[in-house]
């Protein structure tokens, strides 16, 4: 992955004095996702890196693996499809945090988001403004999830909202059982939603980041 393709935050102190963190955005988003910027401001003791990911889960996992290999992050956070992507990425030395991982992505696309063309929510580095979701993609998601087991990081967490307005509450409960069975520690934000809220960030800070990175936290 070329350096010019990356979006890197510019929080002080200088980047080379902080550990690296990667943010993996969800479907219909990009490197300039608002959530990534919120996380980089809250956890500015890390040098945050992200890039544009596409709609192909297998390709996203390969792309994330390349980024991990190059930048050796200590922390990786992904939301929605980004949370799903990071669960399959090889990062044994990083703390993984999957927020509302979209294990039911195919059903969500078919029944909630809808097949066809859609606009991206933010400006992307690749210049793309629209993308297409197809039934073939949905089948590809299902095939990939069926054929692969989530991998663990140095520590692995999955954070869910009690009410997930996009994936559905029932799908969220099923996902909690699946990821918990794979070795991820499951945390639930009773005030959360699919789109990350301040309460979820507080939960991540208090229960994960502050404990996993005691020497790096403010």
Predicted regions: what they are:
Residues 77-86:
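Gly/Ala-rich beta-loop-alpha elbow adjacent to hydrolase catalytic centers
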């Amino acid at each position: 992955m070329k350096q010019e393709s990356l979006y890197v935050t510019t929080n002080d102190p200088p980047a080379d004095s902080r550990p690296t963190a990667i943010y993996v955005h969800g479907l219909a988003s990009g490197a300039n996702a608002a959530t990534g910027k919120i996380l980089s401001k809250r956890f500015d003791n890390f040098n945050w890196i992200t890039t544009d990911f596409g709609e192909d889960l297998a390709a996203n996992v390969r792309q994330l693996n390349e980024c991990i290999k190059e930048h050796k992050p200590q922390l990786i956070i992904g939301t929605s499809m980004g949370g799903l992507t990071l669960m399959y990425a090889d990062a044994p030395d990083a703390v993984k945090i999957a927020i509302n991982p979209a294990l039911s992505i195919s059903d969500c696309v078919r029944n909630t988001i809808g097949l066809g063309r859609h606009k991206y929510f933010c400006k992307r580095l690749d210049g793309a403004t629209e993308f297409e979701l197809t039934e073939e993609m949905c089948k590809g998601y299902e095939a990939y999830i069926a054929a692969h087991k989530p991998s663990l990081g140095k520590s692995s967490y999955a954070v869910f909202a009690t009410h997930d307005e996009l994936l559905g509450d029932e799908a969220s409960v099923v996902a909690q059982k699946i990821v918990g069975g794979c070795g991820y520690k499951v945390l639930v934000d009773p005030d959360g939603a699919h789109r990350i809220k301040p309460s979820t960030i507080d939960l991540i800070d208090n229960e994960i980041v502050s404990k996993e990175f005691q020497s790096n936290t403010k």
